[in-house]
Amino acid sequence: MKITRRDVSKGLAAAASTALMSPSLASSLKPSNLNKPSRHNKNAKRKNVLIIVTDQERARLTLPENLTLPARRRFDDNAVVFEQYHIASLSCAPSRSVIYTGQHVQKTRLFNNPGYGDGAVDLHPSKTPTLGQLFKDIGYKTAYKGKWHLSSVNALKRKDNSQSLQPFGFDEWQKGKDTGGLVYQGANEDSDILADAQDYMNRQLQHDGTDPWLLAINFHNPHDVMWLDANGRQAATRLRPGLVSDMAPAIDQYPYNHDFGFGLPTSFGDDLSTKPEAQQLFLDQAQYFYGQLDPSDEQAHRRVLNYYAACLLDSDKT
C-alpha cells in the first residue's frame, strides 16, 4: 500500500482529530506523569499522531467569499475549531517554540528568531522539553518534517541533517538545511516537505506497526507573502536590502498571479491618530525593514492581500 497526496489530504482531519482527542494519550501527557517511567501497555493499539503546521496563517474571518479552501474546510467539518484562539507570540520562532513545548516564551527564552538580533538564543532541549521528547518518553517513534527555525541547525554545517533534531526528541528530520521562510520557499519547497512526509508514513506501513508514531509536518506557506514587493520599489528602498531575505514580485503563475477580489479592510483609511502609539511605530519600522510602501496605495495593498490568498490556496492544494 502506497500513500498518495490525495490519501494524505483525505485523512488529515480524521487523523488529527482522533489522535489529539485520545483520552489515554491525554492522560499520559499530564504533568504529573512526565517524569515517571513509561508504563504503557505494549499490546494496546495506540493512535498515531499527525501534526500539521502552516506558517504565518491568520484567522479566516476576512477572506473573500469566492476563495475555496477544501482541505481546510475538511478540518473545520471534522474537528474542533478554536474560533477565539489567540497566538502567544507574533514572531516565527517564539510562536513555534510555544507550539512545540506548550510553554510561553518566558520559559522557552525565544524572544526573537535564532541568529537575529542581540541576545537571540536557541531553544534549549534540556531546559524546555518538546513534544518530541514527551512522546518519545511514552514509547512513540517521532519525526519532524519541514521548517524548524528553533535553533541554529545550519551553523552545524552538516551534509546530512536527518538526525540533527534528535536532541529535541525527533528521531528523523531532513537531509537538507533548515529553511527560515525566505522568498518563494513556500511555492518552491512545500511539495518537497509533503513528499518527505509521505515517504516517512510509507516506511512506517512497511514495519509491523507495533510502535505508534508522531509526525510533525511544517509547511512554509502562506509565509511567502512576507517577502512580496508589492509596488516594485520596496526591495530597493529597504534600510538593509537583502536582510534575512530578498523581496520579489509575485510569481507569474497561477495562483500567484490571480486576482481573487480580496478587498481592503474597513480600517484601511485609518490614520492611527486615535490608536496606541505602538501601532504607528510598527508601521514606521515596517517602512525601514520592508521598504517604502505608501499607506494610501490601494493597488499595492490589494496585491498583498491577493498574494496572501494565493499562498493559502497553494498551501491548501499541497
Predicted features by range, described:
Residues 3, 7-16, 23, 29-318:
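Formylglycine-dependent sulfatase
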